[in-house]
Amino acid sequence: MSMQFANVWERVADTVGDEIALINGDKKSSWSSFDSKAAKIATILEEHGLKSDSKVGIYLHNSNEYLEAQYGVFKIEGVPINVNYRYKENELIYLLDNADAEAVFFQGCYADRIKAIKDQLPKIKVYIQVDDGTEPLMQGAIDYENSISSAKEQKRFNRTEENIYMLYTGGTTGMPKGVMYKHGSFIPSMLKTAFAMGFEVPEDINDLEKIVSQAKENNALTVSM
C-alpha cells in the first residue's frame, strides 16, 4: 500500500475507528465517521464527472467540513486546492481558473460572492455549499450534508503516491501560485516530525499501526479547530 493520504487515513480509521478524529466547537467526529463521510464525498465528486487529478477548490473556514472535503478529494486521487476566505472576486476567479478547478466547496456566507463569479468559471462542474446558517442554498449548488446523507460510500482501492498535493501561496507578491508536492515525498517528511516527537516511525505503510497505537496512547489522534 502506497504513501497516499487517503490510503494512510483509511488505515488509521480501520485501526482506531472509535477514536475522535476531529473536534470543532461542540462538533466531534470519530475516525470511522470521518472516513465514511469522505467516502461519500468521493462518490458525489465522481458522479459529477471528477476523477484522478481533478482539482477541487475548498473555500471554507477551518472546520470539520474542510478536512472531510479534502479527504474526499484524496479518495478520488484528486487535488484539493486551498482557497483563502479573504480573497475577493478577482482573486477567486484567477485562482480557480488557474488551478483548473472542476468543483468548489464553499461556506454558505460566501454564496453571494460565488454567485457573482460562477458564470466566469465554465470548468466548474459542481458547487457544494456548507450551510452555516447565513444564506439560503445558492441556485445551482448542492447542499453538503443533504448530498452526503443520500450518497453511497466509494469502494476503496490502492492509490498511487505519485498523486499531487498542491498548496497555493498567499499571493503577497502577485497572484497566488500553486506549489506541487507528490504524496510520496510529502508524507515521509511529516513522519520525520513524528520521529522528532519520539514516535516510532514505520518504514512501510503496512506498519502504520505502530505509530497509530503510540498516538492513541499520547492522545495525539485528534485535530481540534
Functional labels for PLM-detected ranges:
Residues 1-21:
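A short N-terminal helical cap/helix-turn-helix that marks the beginning
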Residues 56, 73, 104, 169-172, ...:
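Conserved S/T- and glycine-rich ATP-binding loop of Class I adenylate-forming
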Residues 18-63, 70-71, 88-93:
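Conserved AMP-binding/adenylate-forming core of the ANL superfamily
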Residues 30-31, 164-192, 197-204, 208:
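Conserved AMP-binding A3 loop
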